[in-house]
Amino acid sequence: EVRSQIMPINRKYPLEALLSACEAYQQAKGRMIWVEYILIDEINTGMDQVEALVGLAKRLQCKVNLIPYNPVGGLEWKRPCGETVSSFRDALHHRGVRVTVRTEKGTDIDAACGQLRLKTEQTAANQALGQAAENA
């Protein structure tokens, strides 16, 4: 349910189908998979999510890269504090998961992961509106 809230595409491509595809890829290529996990404060930073992610990581024998959420205008989600990120990372590590936290750059200028896309879309929409107004 949390995954569907964060990623509406989960309705079209459920997690189980994604995991099966990852397993097929691993068998075919014999390569390690990295799972990217975005941490959103008070949404998916609890112990229930730790346990679910441990199960997924052990099933895939993958590495997990934690990505603290970058605030995006128009969304109410919040970035977790450093202590929450560290606690989540440590909980995974103590359960045998190979885990890293993404080093980020650009958050302070709205240029980090997720932020640039919104800016690009807003700029394109504004340009389209400007052209429509000129042509009217």
For every predicted segment, state its role:
Residues 1-95:
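Conserved AdoMet/S-adenosylmethionine-binding subsite of the radical SAM
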Residues 66, 101-103:
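A structural preference for short, hydrophobic beta-strand core positions in alpha/beta folds
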Residues 94, 104-136:
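Radical SAM enzyme core and accessory elements
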